[in-house]
């Protein structure tokens, strides 16, 4: 309802920083997996509407990132990191840098995409 009342100018970006649980639900994060998947579906639909105004909607789905929340969920973060393909957690700054590079290079045609941002950790293809 709120989104229907927002006046949107032409051009720009809307980024959704979701989670890889939208593709690989996590039993420790049942509610998060459900609402993030649902919101990602809504975001995909909105991407088609906003495309008419040259607004790109890009969903970034991070995997293991070095945040306080990750530390709450994982008992031994250092041991867990060693199991990852890159042997480390992602950095929040890397997500910000990625978003900035999209904007700086005016990459618009990526609209509607979900970007897996997980250091090759996921097993899904799409």
For every predicted segment, state its role:
Residues 7-8, 50-52, 65, 103:
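A short hydrophobic alpha-helix cap/turn motif
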Residues 51, 56, 110-112:
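Short, small/polar-rich loop/turn modules that mediate ligand/substrate recognition or access, typified
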